[in-house]
């Protein structure tokens, strides 16, 4: 069903997370000159650190509190928001923001595409169904 291998999503998420962490760290240097950019960098770090962390370990409570990280639409919208947050500063931040924006739009397109299956880390460990899963067990009769 999926033309895109699952390793692509892992590499894309790790690279976008690392690029955005570096961009947010470079914005932290604006603490004395521009407080608004500094605060945007703090929000940028808060959004980009979980992107990298979720590729290695998925905490069980995060499905309940930050479910937008576990769908293409939610992740795409968060990437677009993150691209707007980190795009202040030098040329590196602008390029990182553009790359993040393009990947966010691509993830939104993947959400509405029928041919891309969601990666394994998007599925909750205890749930039998997830978004786009058509394998429903209808053999159980409800009383």
Swiss-Prot record:
Task: Output the InterPro entries linked to this UniProt entry.
Answer: Golgi_TVP15
Question: Lumenal side: which ranges?
Answer: 32-35, 89
Which keywords has UniProt assigned to this entry? Golgi apparatus, Membrane, Transmembrane, Transmembrane helix
Does this UniProt record's set of keywords contain Metal-binding? no
- One term under GO cellular component: Golgi membrane
In the record, what terms sit under GO molecular function? Answer: identical protein binding
One Pfam annotation, family name? COPI_assoc
Q: Tell me yes or no: is Transmembrane among this UniProt entry's keywords.
A: yes
Mode of membrane association: Multi-pass membrane protein
Q: Which residues cross the membrane?
A: 11-31, 36-56, 68-88, 90-110
Q: Which PANTHER family match?
A: GOLGI APPARATUS MEMBRANE PROTEIN TVP15
Indicate the family of this protein: Belongs to the TVP15 family.
Q: What is this protein called?
A: Golgi apparatus membrane protein TVP15
State the species of origin. Answer: Saccharomyces cerevisiae (strain ATCC 204508 / S288c) (Baker's yeast)
């Amino acid at each position: 069903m999926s033309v895109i291998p699952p390793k692509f999503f892992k590499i894309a998420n790790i690279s976008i997370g690392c690029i955005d962490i570096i961009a947010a760290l470079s914005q932290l240097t604006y603490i004395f000159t521009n407080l608004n950019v500094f605060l945007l960098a703090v929000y940028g770090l808060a959004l980009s650190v979980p992107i990298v962390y979720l590729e290695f370990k998925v905490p069980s409570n995060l499905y309940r509190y930050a479910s937008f990280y576990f769908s293409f639409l939610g992740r795409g919208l968060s990437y677009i928001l993150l691209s707007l947050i980190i795009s202040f500063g030098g040329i590196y931040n602008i390029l990182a923001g553009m790359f993040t924006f393009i990947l966010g739009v691509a993830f939104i397109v993947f959400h509405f595409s029928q041919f891309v299956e969601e990666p394994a880390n998007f599925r909750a460990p205890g749930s039998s169904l997830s978004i786009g899963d058509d394998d429903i067990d209808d053999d159980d009769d409800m009383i």
